[in-house]
């Protein structure tokens, strides 16, 4: 058996030595792997019509325009259009921020729950990416992770779902929905480059007409809503979802939880018209009466 195996190996080696070497010159496709190409001139007209058929508009040089259906009313005119995507490029976009991700950022220490939270803290924590030049108008708080959210926070977002509001207020937190115009939004998410330019902080613009109803509605926790109606809406939401609403006035963090921005204010603790001097680490405040009247209006 061993002798036959040795002779078999030697025989195979001798056969390989006698065969030509594999190169680009002797490579061929496997039999049947390629179909023979059909040469021109083998069809009905034997190549005399150049593949255009016999007479007619298609045989000559001009072709009908795209959508032409031989004279009858074309499809795109007979079927009425409906504006499914009307104004799509002008719609405001809000990036979703789930309660699960917010709790994750708090657990990692990227977001400090003992301080008011707005877009500046969320973007610095790499929790959201907002691009005002692409029609982004902020973030929307969604209810994913409401069952595991356990932080007591004072957060300002642009939109929030009802269940997300209930999950935060159940823990003794506060939610505020605020509007920022594109310029104010750009300053809010990138404050340092703005401060380095040495410009006064501008006034935040009020919401457009189609958003006034949303931000004046207490059920949405709008920043333009009546505070007394917001307190009533908090109690109604607690009854709806069956939890006891904590009394934040007796909380040790009541000062932080009750912190609000003025409707014209962009940053917490910085009023419109102030200039932040990054080099000297100072804040310059206007003293002229006309400037004070303008920025307070």
UniProtKB/Swiss-Prot annotation:
One of its GO terms (cellular component) is mitochondrial large ribosomal subunit. It comes from the Eukaryota. It is found in: Mitochondrion. The keyword Cell membrane does not apply. Residues 36-53 have a biased composition (Basic residues). Keywords: Mitochondrion, Ribonucleoprotein, Ribosomal protein, Transit peptide. Residues 23-69 are annotated as: Disordered. Component of the mitochondrial ribosome large subunit (39S) which comprises a 16S rRNA and about 50 distinct proteins. This is Large ribosomal subunit protein uL15m. Residues 1-21 form a transit peptide. Belongs to the universal ribosomal protein uL15 family. Its main location: mitochondrion. One of its GO terms (biological process) is translation. GO terms for molecular function: structural constituent of ribosome. The gene is MRPL15. InterPro entries: Ribosomal_uL15 (IPR030878), Ribosomal_uL15/eL18 (IPR021131), Ribosomal_uL15/eL18_sf (IPR036227), Ribosomal_uL15_bac-type (IPR005749).
